[in-house]
Amino acid sequence: MKPYFRIEEYEWSHILKIFDKDDVKETLAEVLMSYPIPYPTITENTLYKEYMKLKGIKYPDLLVEDTWYTKMDTYTYDLTYGDKQIYFRRNNVGNASSNYFQVKNRWSVSGTVSPGPERTWNSKEFMTTLMGAMYSMKFTHMDEKILRTMIGIRKYICSQFKPNVAKCIYDYFKSENVLDFSMGWGDRLAGFYASHTGREYVGIDPRTINHEIYKLQKDYYETNTGFFEDGKTSRFICDAAEDVNLTQYSKYFDTIFTSPPYFDVERYSEESTQSWVRHKNLKDWNEKFLHVALENVWNTLKPNGHLLVNISDIYQRATGKDIPLGICDPMNDFLSKFSDSEYKGCIGMELAKRPNCRGIQTGTEHGQERLDEVFCEPIWIWRKTDGI
């Protein structure tokens, strides 16, 4: 196997002095398109070690009592849980336990505003603009790692949901039977198998190609169950959450935990079951996808069970300004109308100050980053009462 393309520091210094910038960008684009996409390298040994580390994480390791903020300061619903602000701090332990299986799949997806890695690598135009990052970011050399950084900042890479947060959620809520109606990249599946309390996981996702990979994950996790661990089972349903028939699971799950798509920010496939394909504006998406899906799965929740939804509002660029588009308040207003629902609060999930996935803007206050505070996405929490 030939070595991957690389430009040493002295070579790049020479290029900067001698050659025209636009010529360099175009030439680099052509050359790199003859190389494979620079996916992160995750070995089987790394997979095993990270999965074992994930099992060892306990929720007190990540759960922090401290103030945090979101990009929206105007939510109607309180951002506390148990009368205090708490959040899961950022930690990369366990990422490889799902990313080993899903990274190429994840890198095949594009965002609304920018192409993903796979689309970029197959377009001379996108590759040429990508090469501009060598200049704007003042890199001194080029290798696979630098290229991944360039893609992550200049283009679009769908981020993972932290498997360690999922594991901690399951253990914190003592979740046994779990429903996830938007499985995504299998990160919450990894967290489930690593959890102490989980027994059964049912996952729903309409993207057909994901399911063969979920099966690989399931087989690996079940093969690597320790002698003293209780066995776990999982089932995957390839369907749209708003359509799927869940009557067999009436009042069955003690926890529903998911992170749905953020309207059309990520376009996972062109399949007719995709919510962004079905609904072309946010109002329809809220009312005909998210709210219908929530009502559908609510019937599967046991009394005293919990629904947890990680979702955030999005921004639309218009006339030079970021216009907020509401998802969270309409969702919570909808859930509040159920006769057997009780809003319990919100737990934060810490993100980088400049999150790339989903094309979501950094949390800001009057356009300025709050650099001395912790930026989080909300995990909204509802409890199902006994209806009396």
Residue ranges with predicted function:
Residues 194-200:
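Conserved S-adenosyl-L-methionine
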Residues 215-248:
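S-adenosyl-L-methionine
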Residues 209-214:
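Short alpha-helix immediately C-terminal to the canonical SAM-binding loop
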Residues 321-388:
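Class I S-adenosyl-L-methionine
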Residues 253-296, 314-322:
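Mobile active-site "lid"/loop adjacent to the S-adenosyl-L-methionine
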Residues 1-159, 321-329, 344:
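N-terminal accessory regions of S-adenosyl-L-methionine
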Residues 166-172, 178-191, 203-205, 239-241, ...:
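Conserved proline-anchored active-site loop of SAM-dependent methyltransferases
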Residues 305:
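Glycine-centered, small-residue-biased loops immediately flanking beta-strands
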